[in-house]
Structures are given as structure tokens and as C-alpha cells.
Amino acid sequence: GKSFLRLNVSGDLPSESYINDERKIDKNALNKIYLATRKTNTTTYTYTHLHCDKKNKEYNLNAVKEHSKENFVINISTEIKKNALKHYFNGHDVVITNTKLFNEAVKHQIETGKQKQLKTDQGTVKLFPCDAQYKESNCNKCRKCSEYNRSEIIIFKEH
């Protein structure tokens, strides 16, 4: 089987500086990581909060869009539904950590056999509750977070 790697289990993507209120993604460092994962044919995924950086927000979102691709997925990590939807409809792969919404999504899925959906002006998006948080599963079995350009927002409960 193919290697499977989650980057930055703690921390975030490489930045040009690490001053707390200013984190600009270091594209050069990110590119080196990408090339290393390609050499080893590794399915790689990670999460970032660097879109929250007030000063470098747009730069960081563009850097994510530029570097996130098949087998190298950078998930935009959110806590608020409105932000999750905004980034999803802007073409990003998105995860949200929201225990209340997670519990609703799991309940809906168990009761109806269908994924809970969020309806918005821009369209409808399905929620995928993290399998490892409510089923006998794990990241290596599921791999949903490593799917590029996916049609769902993945939802976690706080952990």
C-alpha cells in the first residue's frame, strides 16, 4: 500500500515568520515538503488555521489553493459554520470542529442513513462526521481528510 502521512499534528504550515499575530506561509518550504512527498509517492494531508492571520489572510488562502492538490491536501480548518461554508464555496477543502453540529450530523446519519446537509444561498453541502470519532475506524482506514476537491465538509467534535 501507499504511504499515508499527516503533516503538522501540532503546529501549522511553515511560515516566513512566527510572530504570533503575523504568520505568512513560506511557499518555498511548503514546496520542498510537497516535492519530498512526491518522491516517496506518499498521500499527504494537513490542516491550517493560517487563513485566520489578519494581515496575511488572502496571501495564505492563495498559497493553500496553489499548493493543495491530489495526494497533497491542505484542509482549511474552521470552527464557525459561516466560515466553513465561505471557504468551501471558494473552492477549498474544509473541515470544521463543532461538537454540536457533529452530534447533529451523526444523529441524522444514523436515523436516516443519509448525510446531513447545510443549505445556503450558494448551494447545498453535505457534512461528513469524522469516522474515527464515532465508529470503529481510524484515519488510515477512512482517509477522507486526504481526498482532494471533495464534495463534503468534514466535521469533528472537539477533542
Predicted regions and their residues:
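Class I S-adenosyl-L-methionine
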Residues: 1-159
